[in-house]
């Protein structure tokens, strides 16, 4: 399973800055939905490490992520291989730089979870799609989201850690019992981003495969 592709469908729901420390007594789903209105853009560098079911490291990568509401993502992996994933909310591009190959496909609008539906920030939608709990500490909070659709989404749960009012870590456990941890740094919220960052125009020599 490609954890990066799962995150493309999920990341937009989480990229915002907290307006304050989260209260344990408040409803986690409502808090998460309310916080969606706090961001327009998000930029960060990331480091990823993936463990198998025996806690052995099976993958490491790093790069950067950019998001602009509604529905626009750019995920660049620099190592171990260079890959760029872009969506403008309508089309999804996956560009493997070393192979000079890109795949192009429509971004599904009828699937149960996709960036457009998650970015809506609707409490009703969140409750339909996830069971959400929260574990607060004096200076941080962690949300856990368990999909109500079960194994059809290829992951068991996702956890989001917020420190100093920003999302700093994301953990995904997939159905193969592989755990991927993404740590975010050099975070910028609501800084200007050009819409051209979320469009892909292949240069000459790039093989384009349409799906």
Curated annotation (Swiss-Prot):
Cellular component per GO, a single term: outer membrane-bounded periplasmic space
Superkingdom, taxonomy of origin: Bacteria
InterPro entries found in the cross-reference section: LolA/LolB/LppX (IPR029046), OM_lipoprot_carrier_LolA-like (IPR004564), OM_lipoprot_carrier_LolA_Pbac (IPR018323)
GO BP field: lipoprotein localization to outer membrane; lipoprotein transport
Gene3D superfamilies the UniProt entry points to: Lipoprotein localisation LolA/LolB/LppX (2.50.20.10)
Signal sequence extent: 1-26
UniProt keyword annotations, A-Z: Chaperone, Periplasm, Protein transport, Signal, Transport
Subcellular location: Periplasm
Its biological purpose: Participates in the translocation of lipoproteins from the inner membrane to the outer membrane. Only forms a complex with a lipoprotein if the residue after the N-terminal Cys is not an aspartate (The Asp acts as a targeting signal to indicate that the lipoprotein should stay in the inner membrane).
Subunit text: Monomer.
Family classification: Belongs to the LolA family.
Name of the protein described by the UniProt record: Outer-membrane lipoprotein carrier protein
Origin species: Coxiella burnetii (strain RSA 493 / Nine Mile phase I)
């Amino acid at each position: 399973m490609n954890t990066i592709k799962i995150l493309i469908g999920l990341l937009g729901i989480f990229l915002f800055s907290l307006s304050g420390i989260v209260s344990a007594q408040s409803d986690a789903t409502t808090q998460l939905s309310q916080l969606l209105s706090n961001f327009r853009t998000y930029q960060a560098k990331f480091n990823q490490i993936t463990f198998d079911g025996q806690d052995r490291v099976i993958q490491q990568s790093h790069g950067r992520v950019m998001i602009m509401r509604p529905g626009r993502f750019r995920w660049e992996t620099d190592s171990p291989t260079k890959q760029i994933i872009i969506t403008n909310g309508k089309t999804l591009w996956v560009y493997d730089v070393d192979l000079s190959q890109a795949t192009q496909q429509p971004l599904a609008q009828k699937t149960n979870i996709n960036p457009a539906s998650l970015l809506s920030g609707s409490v009703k939608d969140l409750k339909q799609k996830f069971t959400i709990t929260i574990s607060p500490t004096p200076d941080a909070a962690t949300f856990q989201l368990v999909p109500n659709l079960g194994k059809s989404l290829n992951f068991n749960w996702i956890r989001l850690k917020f420190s100093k009012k920003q999302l700093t870590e994301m953990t995904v456990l997939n159905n193969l019992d592989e755990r991927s941890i993404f740590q975010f740094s050099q975070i910028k919220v609501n800084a200007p981003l050009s819409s051209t960052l979320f469009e892909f125009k292949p240069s000459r020599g790039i093989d384009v495969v349409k799906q």
